[in-house]
Amino acid sequence: MTPPSWLRVARLSELADDVPLSLDADGTPLVAVRHAGTVSVFEGLCPHQGSLLADGQVVAGQLVCPGHGWRFDCASGRRAGDPATCLHRFDTHIADDALYIDVDELRAFHARRAAHAPTARPLASLPGPDGLPLFGNLFQLRETRQHLILEQWADTFGPLYRLQLGPYRVMVVADPAVVQDAFKRRPDTFRRLGRFAAIAREVGADGVFTAEGDDWRRQRKVTTQALGHGQLKHFFPALMRITGRLRGRWERAADAGHEVDLLDDLTRFTIDVTSAFAFGEDLNTIDGHAGTLSRQLNEVPKALSRRAIAMLPYWRLFRLPADRALDEAREGLTATLARLTDDARRQIAEDPGLAARPVNYLQGLVAQQLAGEHAFSDENVSGNVMTLMLAGEETTARALAWLIYYMCEKPGLQAQLRGESDAVLGESGLLHDFADHPRMVLIEAAAHEAMRLKPPAPIHRLEALHDTTLGGIELPKGALAFLLTRHATTREQAGDGADADAFDL
């Protein structure tokens, strides 16, 4: 019989040798590891910067953090090279197929963490811009400039300030350490806005991006396995084929002296790449082959953007032409994804080896579904395929467009990047060996610098799931936290003399 002081955290059969397993105990992230016949349960966040240790790997008897490579002994939890830094290792109890930890020890762990936390202040004590009665600051935030307005207010009121958006109390965070703290406390303390998740479900993009809690953990495990390094390597020839198509389009335009719409072409490029990777369909929108499927896919991001900024969810009361177009597109996409899912299931049945080497993301999801380790429905499959399509199109296209913009502004940088690409790519202008991509060091650095200045998501909006504190400020359940990810990186640091708002390698 198991004593009442023990809390069940996992089934032992879920724990494979040398594969970290993500656990949750009353909202506390943990990680379980089985190595050399010994099962250990540790605190789940790396003490360095809070990375989720379950996303790491076991190498030579050490649990390696996915963030910055800190290594912890699988038996003791001590950090390699710094034994003073040690993960908390919980006492465990195993009965039949169940793995337990001591509830009293978990409470003591919480108490020690709480004892080191500073005394919190109420949200109302923060400064903030004046607003209107009832509406607060709602009408001061124009959607197209929202991140710029919030950053300007951070310059005025400091890295932590408050807003009132109608009935919602908002804490705006521009302090990088506090932003990071909020991120690492997802999904148990903070979630994405419930309103956005509901809209994503309505447009058919209900996947890991909108999932929360245990559902997020379940879907994340499956989707990360379906996005493994092997799948990316297998997809590489298709990526180069589509890249060559874009290159050819631009070469023809240059020879004819025609201008190109850079963002439109890059959006077509990312649509072709993402659809080929997601479900194996090369839509070839670069050459203008706008078939039914590409038109249907185009309706989803438009509807998501339109509904995300709407003041009221009017579409739940009546339908406008754009909403009817979405309904028609969703019906077609649902049928297409159901057919592709059935095809993937049949292909794996005919060639079981595809389960270990799927040729696209959808096939990888179906392989994980058939393995049966995690409950994963056909709706989960289609929702995560649509999530990948949304995540891979417009944001990637804009990031590439900004990189090219900065490159064109700086002829010296352009010459450097061209020199590196010529050295790596040769006369063909395309990368032929997947193993060569790490040699493009300057190009990768330039991409990171462009995303520092122009990140695809300069604001992350979270909602408190229960009463909590953030940055020493009390946040009641339902309060919102707007995280500004760009602000600190574009402001000059005292005394360094650098222009932080300028592109600089």
Regions found by a protein language model. Give the residues of each.
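N-terminal membrane-proximal hinge/A-helix region immediately C-terminal to the signal-anchor transmembrane segment
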Residues: 116-205, 209-218, 237-248, 269, ...
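N-terminal pre-ligand scaffold of iron-sulfur
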Residues: 1-60, 78, 88-115
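Cytochrome P450 fold signature focused on the C-terminal beta-domain
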Residues: 344-358, 418-440, 453-473, 498-501
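Cytochrome P450
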Residues: 164-171, 230-241, 251-276, 284-292, ...
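Conserved cytochrome P450 catalytic core segment spanning the I/J/K helices
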Residues: 133, 139, 228, 329-399, ...
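Conserved cytochrome P450 K-helix E-x-x-R motif and the immediately C-terminal K′/meander segment
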Residues: 138-158, 335, 339, 430-471
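Conserved cytochrome P450 K-helix/beta-meander segment immediately N-terminal to the heme-binding cysteine loop
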Residues: 483-505
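Cytochrome P450 catalytic-core helices
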Residues: 395-420
